[in-house]
Every structure is written in C-alpha cells, then in structure tokens.
Amino acid sequence: PVAAIEEHLVELRVVPGPRDDWLVDPDALVHTIWMASNRSDRVGMRLQGRPLQHRWPDRQLPGEGVTRGAIQVPPNGLPVILGPDHPITGSYPVVGVITDEDIDKVAQIRPGQYVRLHWARPRSRLPGQGVTQAW
C-alpha cells in the first residue's frame, strides 16, 4: 500500500515522450504547478492550469495503445494523466509517462490538490529546440 499523501503539493516524476515534440514548449509541463480537477476519475486525472500549446494544432495522430500514467494533451492544452480504466489515446499526443515509482501516488491525489511534475531524465531535443547532444 501507498502511504496517504498529506502534503498539499504532490511531486511526480515523468519520463519524457514519446510525443513531447508535439508541444511548442514541452518543458512548460514541468514548469507549471497544476491542480487536480474535480472532473477526474479512474479514466484519468485532469489537470487545471495554464494550457500547453500544441506545435501542430491542425494535425491528428492515429489512436495508440498507452499505459497507465501516460500524460496526454487534448486540444484544450490541459494534460490528463491516464488511470487504470483509460482508453487508447484518442488522437492526442502522449508527452510523458509517470514513473513506476510514482504511479500509485496518482490515485491518492484529491481534487483541488496541487501537482508538480519533474522530468525523470533529460528530454531528447529536436534541432532548433535548444541544446542537442552529439553522439
């Protein structure tokens, strides 16, 4: 069992990708303090805060299978952390996945509680998105 979360701010680690490049500023996901919506359920925890901007708002992805903890960003720009009863993606990009170590915390988060996401490892960057790593 996971210990009850007493803090008002819950910290969650996120593995970047696979489609974080579909956001204008993927790091905005981890630079925003989100609030858990009262519209959350076993399908997903909806986050409220400053909407993320899609890089290609007119493009759609085919539906894809995902795992519990995947973070998809629908057209309104407000992330949804998918829960145990999640469907396929519904054409929305998955920009990260909550780490295995933190996934059980998601079920403990109450509506109105604040959530801060952190990259669990550095993001891969596309050319033109800042520093790239040479191999």
Mark where each language-model region is.
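Conserved "landmark" site that anchors the functional core of diverse proteins
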Residues: P1-W135
